[in-house]
């Protein structure tokens, strides 16, 4: 949605999986660096893999996606990581998607209004990047980076699991054994919920009680609709 006005067929590097080699860029390149927000922070594994790339002075647009509560200082953290990897951040976007733990929160998002605004942001960023003296991103820190130690709950596979292994092959941190994909290695799992999203038979899920309790806790904090935000 955001990149469409800037590139019809962008090259995609998936930071959710181990990198194959070292991606290298140059000042002629424009990179959209996107991460989800976990507890107000950028996922450590995403930042580690970003550090394995070589920005080479490429201009970067930063994107933080959160579940309608707050992304806190995710973008500030991502900006620092991008600069250390050799990128030059030029713009940043906060966007909302359906909450990964409690799908009833921000259900159906990004929706049509989100799509319209993100496409508009893409056009504005595209035009900005053509300006010869466009300044780099100015992004103030909201507060102290709040520690996030992960969640004490993890998805498990139920009886419908066919053992196809798709979840194991796509787990960002290798927390699902390929020989027994019905299991979850809790010491590795970051509760990103990717396994739940990709399971073809919907066998993986969190405990319904956990989802219900989390929904009660987040209901007030997430009641007001948050809108996408563009920052220069």
Model-derived features: where do they sit?
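A mid-sequence, solvent-exposed acidic-amphipathic segment
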Residues: 135-172
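Iron-sulfur cluster-binding cysteine motifs and their immediate structural context
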Residues: 157, 162, 166-190, 194-211
